[in-house]
Amino acid sequence: MTTPSMEDYIEQIYMLIEEKGYARVSDIAEALAVHPSSVTKMVQKLDKDEYLIYEKYRGLVLTSKGKKIGKRLVYRHELLEQFLRIIGVDEEKIYNDVEGIEHHLSWNSIDRIGDLVQYFEDDESRKKELKSVQKKTENPGE
């Protein structure tokens, strides 16, 4: 079972490896705005729990278990961003809102949000209808 903090690290490591082909402690620390010693401590825990393989001074690689979870965590994050965009959340608020909610939703809830996103993506008129409803509730009496 992963904690929210472990998930943040796995997600970031997965994204760095996808983007650069590798993830160093310094890159992870910079991306998460934490001290490198905190990264080393967490990486050692993730190694012990078999999410990655870490060799001091040599770098790290995600295990198949780590890759699977990393991919799912990135999907969750991107899906929630997409959902918040569809429902009209201000762009500058989306990242922090996703960070605030992503660890508190069950995978069942994530899957249902995915269904809802798909529903809106399948037919552009549904998005327009939602915007129309939002306009009415924001400006009652118009």
From Swiss-Prot:
Subunit and interaction comment: Homodimer.
Designated gene of the protein: mntR
Alphabetized SMART domains for the sequence: HTH_DTXR
Highest classification ranks of the organism: Bacteria, Bacillati, Bacillota, Bacilli, Bacillales
Family: Belongs to the DtxR/MntR family.
Keyword presence, Kinase: no
Activity regulation: DNA binding is strongly activated by Mn(2+).
GO biological process entries: intracellular manganese ion homeostasis
Disulfide bonds: none
Protein name: HTH-type transcriptional regulator MntR
Binding site for Mn(2+) 2: E11, H77, E99, E102
Role of this protein: Central regulator of manganese homeostasis.
